[in-house]
Amino acid sequence: MKVTLPDFRRAGVLVVGDVMLDRYWYGPTSRISPEAPVPIVKVDAIEERPGGAANVAMNIAALGCHSRLVGLTGIDDAARALGARLSEVDVTCDFVAVATHPTVTKLRVLSRNQQLIRLDFEQGFDDVDAAPMIERIQLALPKTGALVLSDYAKGALARVREMITLARAAGVPVLVDPKGTDFDRYRGATLLTPNLSEFEAVAGPCKDEETLVSRGMKLIADYQLSALLITRSEQGMTLLQPGKDPLHLPTQAQEVYDVTGAGDTVIGVLAAALAAGNSLEDSCFLANAAAGVVVGKLGTSTVSPIELENAIRGRAETGFGVMTESELKQAVAVARQRGEKVVMTNGIFDILHAGHVSYLANAQRLGDRLIVAVNSDESTKRLKGESRPVNPLAQRMTVLAALEAVDWVVPFSEDTPQRLIADVLPDVLVKGGDYQPHQIAGSKEVWDNGGDVLVLNFEDGCSTTNIINAIKRRAGQRTVV
């Protein structure tokens, strides 16, 4: 199944549901409390992340898609923290603040990556007037490519049937992450995304694939759905649609550290892809790939376009090929989160030869990821004359990207890559030839950041100029210097 990423930037998704704040307290534990037989955690780090429907909205925004979030909060520090964090990642918040209720907050205490306890602060919003929620939805629907209803049974979706009716009347697909066993309240939705246990709680235990499919199709008919996506943990996910064969997508997870928020990622990526114009099948494929990435992270997390692109290409999450500067910065950030050492070099690489290959292999051995910055055609002409480059930029970058030693290839248009190096700040900056380290463009910035600057030897007798001159001699033309 070949799927490409759509242009998420042209899409908009409205998320409505139960927003919450996930708080994490981290610290070591080395002794038992004298007051009770419980461990003492010395808290040395605190983290706050949007959860529930807010995590769905973050996953959508992380792809570059316009994300608007409607939900209920209290008037408290948790609501302010939630709004501030969401604003940082370009989620448009349209909250209804309720003075009589606290913002739903879940506090987790962790030590050595193990969760010791979770404390929930919540009252439920079932008794709150939902009219302001409906008004906000009506105003947002005309600019929305898809509506996500994220149900955590906290009361924000008390009038969910009305929300579905409004969206369908506006021609907007409705995707629901359900909660509980009353699926009738989601009647008429475009798609439901229950996990296997949620599905079986409604449809009954499924001993085999045939039973799962038949009961899923019955559920679609009973509740007038357009489709059903059952997420099945290590068994992947299954898409059911009337009149079509079931589509089973095997899991793509390589390592599973934490499944917290994985369902939010699935429905968020699925909605963003649909809103951007992908088919439902292709959107499910992308959502499945995103789930495989996010479960490899700790806590509620998002997936970037770079990670998703790499996941669907079946390569390592942070490494492949030709990139723009903004994509490179994202990829480097992901690599650093994994503790990887980033090496960077630059050059024209006009006619790739054995000396280049040997040099790049040696550079790659200095770290975990190798960036090659390549002079643009205009930059090359200024440095080498009007007869260069022999090969245009796109071809030079394609050849470099095919080398096993190279992770990322990025162009630059200036005479030197100093600005780009200062922006990326690699752990190791490498240049080949007879330079002194202080002469290398970007060396000061790398040193100031605590990095290393190294000079590697080129292989004797190998140069692009020598190759060009040899070709010209054989053709009887004037050689170049």
UniProtKB/Swiss-Prot annotation:
EC number: 2.7.1.167, 2.7.7.70
Gene Ontology MF annotations: ATP binding; heptose 7-phosphate kinase activity; heptose-1-phosphate adenylyltransferase activity; phosphotransferase activity, alcohol group as acceptor
Main enzyme class: transferase
GO biological process: ADP-L-glycero-beta-D-manno-heptose biosynthetic process
Residue ranges of the region described as Cytidylyltransferase: 344-481
Catalysed reactions, as listed in the record: D-glycero-beta-D-manno-heptose 7-phosphate + ATP = D-glycero-beta-D-manno-heptose 1,7-bisphosphate + ADP + H(+); D-glycero-beta-D-manno-heptose 1-phosphate + ATP + H(+) = ADP-D-glycero-beta-D-manno-heptose + diphosphate
Domain of life: Bacteria
One GO CC annotation: cytosol
Residues annotated as the enzyme's active site: 264
Listed CDD domains: RfaE_like (cd01172)
Keywords: ATP-binding, Carbohydrate metabolism, Kinase, Multifunctional enzyme, Nucleotide-binding, Nucleotidyltransferase, Transferase
Region feature (Ribokinase): 1-318
Coiled coil start-end: none
Family to which the UniProt record says this protein belongs: In the N-terminal section; belongs to the carbohydrate kinase PfkB family. In the C-terminal section; belongs to the cytidylyltransferase family.
Function statement: Catalyzes the ADP transfer from ATP to D-glycero-beta-D-manno-heptose 1-phosphate, yielding ADP-D-glycero-beta-D-manno-heptose.
Subunit structure as annotated in this protein's UniProt entry: Homodimer.
Name of the protein: Bifunctional protein HldE
Taxonomic source organism: Sodalis glossinidius (strain morsitans)
Gene, per the UniProt record: hldE
